Amino acid sequence: LVRYLSGGSPLPLDQPLPIYTIMFFQNIIGMLLISAWIWKTKQFKLELNTNRPWLHTFRIITAALGIGLWYLSLRYIPVTQVVALSFIAPIITVLAAVLILRENFDLQRKIAVILSISGGFLIARPDRALINSTIYSWYMLLPLLAAFVFSLDKVLTRELLKQYESPRALTWYLLTFIAPLSLLPMLYYGWVSPTTEHLPWLLLLGSLGALAHYAFNKAYELAEVTFLLPFGAAKLIICALASYIIFFEIPKTFDMWLGITVITLSTMVLSINAKFFNKFSKQPLPLAS
């Protein structure tokens, strides 16, 4: 939807919108929808009441900072190199989840994470981007910092939900804070009003964005970070499928198809009964009689 509204798709659009305008309306619509949902439960104050205001604040800051660093990276570094350097994010996330949250990282999850990272690597081929890179400045640190901050955001989300915070509350706090920030680019670039042609798509985009944030938080309420991480790589498959259905774009490289297959295997590994992997785990040696 963002690609279509910004004029980057082959589908016709009379007046493309700037990215910052799309993001502003997406966040505003998402905030209004999640507010209406909480209000309908008649527990608005109760659900938004929190005993961890500073942890909420820290999480919101990390989310906003991560987005800012990501967009700043795209300003100074080619997209392929930003994506390449961002491949360190799953590794940082796993380390943070194991060291900070003390999550289980058994053989089954290790295999799934390794497969998902490998599949993403095959699709994006960050090695080619880095080999061809001519940028050797501090700008290269920006996507690395963004990856670190996004990983910290996942850990903070899981920690808040472990302390019985509501997934809807986390979604509301995030969108309510980020929506006003979306106005900042307009102070520099100027306001661009959407037309009636844009409004249905912006409404759909805002709804899907709010749903995605809520689903993300709900998932982290129900499962550990190390378990959910391989499923995040599946978005590459979904994006490829959406590109085929909407834009008629078919992956043409063998690496792309191989990467999709490997990521699919990573999610299948997590569906296998854990008892199967316990057979291969290290067992204590029997004591001598």
Predicted regions and their residues:
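Residue-level recognition of pore/gate-forming positions within transmembrane alpha-helices
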Residues: N27-M31, F87-I91, V113-G120, L175-A179, ...
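Helix-helix packing/entry segments at the starts of transmembrane helices
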Residues: V82-I88, L160-F177, H213-I245
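Hydrophobic/small/kink-forming positions within alpha-helical transmembrane segments
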Residues: I28, I60-G68, P90-L95, F121, ...
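C-terminal-most transmembrane helix of multi-pass membrane proteins
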Residues: A233-S289
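Structural signature of hydrophobic alpha-helical transmembrane segments
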Residues: P18-L32, L72-A89, I135-V149, T195-G209, ...
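Membrane-interface interhelical linkers
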Residues: G7-P12, I19, F25-F58, I131-I135, ...
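Hydrophobic alpha-helical transmembrane segments in multi-pass integral membrane proteins
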Residues: L1-R3, G68-S73, F121-N132, I178-V192, ...
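Loop-to-transmembrane alpha-helix entry segments
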Residues: S86, R102-L122, S133, S137-Y139, ...
